[in-house]
Amino acid sequence: MKRTNYAGNITEEYLNQTITVKGWVAKRRNLGGLIFIDLRDREGIVQIVVNPETAATEVAEAADKARNEFVLEVTGKVVERASKNDKIKTGGIEIEATAIEILSTSKTTPFEIKDDVEVLDDTRLKYRYLDLRRPEMLKNITMRHATTRSIREYLDGAGFIDVETPFLNKSTPEGARDYLVPSRVNKGEFYALPQSPQLMKQLLMTAGLDRYYQIVKCFRDEDLRGDRQPEFTQVDLETSFLGEEEIQELTEELIAKVMKDVKGIDVTLPFPRMNYDDAMNFYGSDKPDTRFELLLTDLSALAKTVDFKVFQEAEVVKAIVVKGAADKYSRKSIDKLTEQAKQNGAKGLAWVKFEKGEFAGGISKFLAESTDSFVNELKLTDNDLVLFVADSLDVANSALGALRLTIGKQQGLIDFRKFNFLWVIDWPMFEWSDEEERYMSAHHPFTLPTKETQAFLSADGHRKDSDLKKVRAHAYDIVLNGYELGGGSLRINSRDLQEEMLSALGFKLEDANEQFGFLLEALDYGFPPHGGLALGLDRFVMLLAGKDNIREVIAFPKNNKASDPMTQAPSIVADKQLEELSIKLANKDQ
């Protein structure tokens, strides 16, 4: 029989009609001679009722055999439900079955198919096809679809052209580790899966497409966490002849449409702007969560007047004030905060409580003579807790920024109903890497430096590392609730400037030509001013769905070991396959 509608869509409009629905048994109950079956599909649940005394024999037998997760086809008459269930859309009706066909049986599932189920993450991933049956997961996946549909509608209407770029690319440095793909035809050579379509989309601008977009898979071999996966999806944009503000305005309109279409929320435009230095100095993060205050305060000048060696020897002394919460933090809980500060690079965490007009605990004895000065500077009131980090500027910001987020959650300062969008602008072009022991591009090597600071890139033999700190970028990140939602920039469209940039990053001219020769050559052929942005689709949908891990909005994600418990990927391959690729494994037996 042809399905009349989804089970979850059968409402009072079908009263007294004979219909057919198909789906999975969510629950079966035998109560007082009547058999009730909750039939589930992607749209919801409808109640089926069978009276074995009046139903046809084959209907009663099928209802008696049915068990959870059996797949049924049910035909019957829609009648008004005596005991209504206002919690579901179909709660006003039920279907009196006149025919039931068992389309498929099911073993007992390894976990219940319901939302609030306690099960190990790897078990969920091993049986992901079952996990996706849960209403919450179905909702997440359909929300993802609604998001991409809204994005495409906006970009198509704004004159963007959807272009596919290649997955088999050249491996280039200046990023995370690549996933490499060996070439059988070109023995000993490798493709790299793209970390982004960055260079290809720039080439599309010199090709004259003017406005490009793509919702595209990208790949990065990096350490995983809740908002990272080895393969992820981004909304990739590039435009010609637009400035920073125009690209930002276009992005805001795109996001506003998604918020309205998917969440029914009207967001206020334009989004606030905050320069990078303010984000770091006041929030301790380049992706500040602005849903709550708890700002960082620089106390360096005042702190160095105190007879406390730790303060006097530090580059900076910064603090956060936890208002009215001193009595909520025991020494043990402060010790936990200290450990977190150390994990973020700090040597330690100093603290005091302000109680009844005096400092108590922690380093209070060192501040006794300067109590009024600190009270005035920090605007302290009774029962405040003050946390200090004395260190380099970067470490103080990073450590207190992390504590700020922890305390915000502990104290219930965050309004989780809010969606606070923010642009972080005026970025430095370079950032120091302790691991590489050199300056690296804060975004990527193709970002356009500001005219005012381009001179510091000069490779005339006099450039110092310290000069690179002064170079600023036409770069902008969009932040949502403390997550980097996306990042973009204006790009370099001059070969000379691009070569200067690569030189500043340590590339010799011959190395630059070997790695990026195709781009450098293209810059000789009338490259228009251009810029763009990439939004993390997985992260965006995660935040829209109110989740804290992007696995919840990806159909078939990897676990924290970059493995798939369901397919057992990655896996060992046959020796013959390796031979065809001219690959020999080192330490194969280890």
Swiss-Prot record:
Top-level enzyme category: ligase
Any one Gene Ontology cellular component term annotated for this protein = cytoplasm
* SUPFAM superfamilies reported for this sequence: Class II aaRS and biotin synthetases, GAD domain-like, Nucleic acid-binding proteins
User: What are its GO biological-process terms?
Assistant: aspartyl-tRNA aminoacylation
Which Gene Ontology molecular function entries are recorded, alphabetically? aspartate-tRNA ligase activity; ATP binding; catalytic activity, acting on a protein; nucleic acid binding; transferase activity
**Principal location listed in the UniProt entry:** cytoplasm
Subunit annotation: Homodimer.
**Protein's name in the database:** Aspartate--tRNA ligase
Species for this entry: Lactococcus lactis subsp. cremoris (strain SK11)
